[in-house]
Amino acid sequence: MVSPRKGKRIRMLKKNDIIQVAISDLSHEGAGVAKHDGFVFFVDNALPEEVIDMRVLKVNKNSGFGKVEAYHYLSPARNADVNLTYLRTGIADLGHLTYEDQLTFKKKQVQDSLYKIAGISDVTVESTIGMTEPLAYRNKAQVPVRRVNGQLETGFFRKHSHDLIPISDYYIQDKEIDRLINFTRDLLRRFDIKPYDETEQTGLLRNIVVRRGHYSGEMMVVLVTTRPKVFRVDQVIEKIVEAFPAVVSIIQNINDENTNAIFGKDFKTLYGKDTITDSMLGNNYAISAQSFYQVNTVMAEKLYQTAIAFSDLSKDDIVIDAYSGIGTIGLSFAKTVKAVYGVEVIEAAVRDAQQNAALNGITNAYFVADTAEHAMATWAKDGIKPSVILVDPPRKGLTESFIQASVAMGPQKITYVSCNPATMARDIKRYQELGYKLAKVQPVDLFPQTHHVECVVLLIKE
C-alpha cells in the first residue's frame, strides 16, 4: 500500500498492534476518534486532546476500533472519578467527561447533524438544558440476572457481549432502586433461586425490573421468570414488602423464549396493584410494567415545557399528538388548548392514555389506537384542523408517509421531539422541502452521563 503523501510506504496495521495516536474528536456515540495513516479509529474512554498508546482491536477497509493501553496526556475535560465499570457496560458511556463538557458535546451533535444531513447552519442551536444533579436520576431499572463465580448476580452486560459484570451501585439509577435490587438479589440467593443460563436455556430468573415514582415514591418490582411457578414466592413477597413498604406492586412476567426481549407476553400481579402512580407537570399517571414513561422525570418535565413553549398555544388551538403513548405529552398540552387528538398503534398504551385523562379529569383529550397516517386522514374528513402537530417518534424517526399525511393536515406549526439528531435532521430536511421552515432548536439532557440527547425543534409553515 502506497500513501498519496510523497509515496511513503505504510505498514498495514493488524489486530493487537500498539500505536501512539492523538484523539481529535468524539463520535456521536461518545468514542474517541483518532486518525492514523488514512485510518479512522474509534476508542472507548478517550477524549479530544488526549495522546494515548492504542491497541488495535479490529481493522476494516478505512476504519477500525482500538482500546487504550496507556495515556501520555490527559484532557482537562476528563472526569477522573468515574468507575470504569460504567464505561465498560455502557451505563454511563460519557461518565469520563465533565458534565459541562457533556452538555457542549450534545449541542454539537445536534449542530453537526443539522449541517451534515439537512444543510442547515443559519438556525441557532441553543445550549443544552442540563440537570442540576446529573446522577441517580433514572426512575426505572431493567437488570439481568445470571450466575457469576457460582452465585446469583445482578448487574449489566459488558458492551457488545452477554458477559454480566456484577454491580451494586448503578450510578445513574435512583438510589432507592439500587437498594431494592440489591436486597432482592441477596434474598433470592438465600432462597436458592436459580438464575437464567442463556447458553443452556436453563434456570428460573431472567431479569429484575424496578420502577419508582419520582414524586410519589411508589415502587414496583417485576420478576421475569422462565416458567410460571416460583419457589417460595409468598416468602419472597413478604420479605420485600417488609423491608420496602413503598413497594405497592409485585408482578411476575413469564418469558420462556430464546430472545433478548426483556418481557414475555404474560403478566401476573402477585402483590398489590397492577400499576404505580406518579405525576408530571401536575398530572397523575398510572404506570404499568410495560408503560413507556420517561426515565428521567425532572428533565422530561423540562422537555415537555419546552415543547409547550415552542408551540405557543391558546385556548382556540387544536393539537394532534402523534406517538401519544400513555398520554404524558398530550395531557400536558390539554390544559392550554381547545382539544388534543392523540394516536398510538399500541392498544394497551391507548387504554392507559384514556385512563390517565379520566384520572386527571381531562375531558378535551381524545386517544385512538391506529396508525397516525390513517387517523389523520379520518380526522381531516371530520373537519378537524390542527394548529399544531406534535411528534415524538422512536429513534428511526418519521416515515415518508407520515410526513406527507402531517403536511396534508396543514398545521401552522410542527413541534418535533427527537431522541436521535440524525433522523431528526433527515426529517427536518424533508419538511423544509414541503414548505416548513426550521425556527427553533433546543437540546435537552434527559440522559446525563450517556451520549444520548433529546431535542425539541419548531417548524413553521411558510
Swiss-Prot record:
InterPro entries: MeTrfase_TrmA_AS, MeTrfase_TrmA_CS, NA-bd_OB-fold, SAM-dependent_MTases_sf, TRAM_dom, U5_MeTrfase_fam
TRAM domain ranges (all copies): 12-70
Catalytic residues of the enzyme: 419 (nucleophile)
Keyword Phosphoprotein: no
One record GO biological process: rRNA base methylation
GO MF annotation terms: rRNA (uridine-C5-)-methyltransferase activity
Enzyme nomenclature, EC number: 2.1.1.-
Pfam families, sorted: TRAM (PF01938), tRNA_U5-meth_tr (PF05958)
PROSITE patterns linked to this entry: SAM_MT_RNA_M5U, TRAM, TRMA_1, TRMA_2
CDD domains xrefs: AdoMet_MTases (cd02440)
TM helices/strands, residue ranges: none
Name of the protein described by the UniProt record: Uncharacterized RNA methyltransferase spyM18_1360
Record organism: Streptococcus pyogenes serotype M18 (strain MGAS8232)
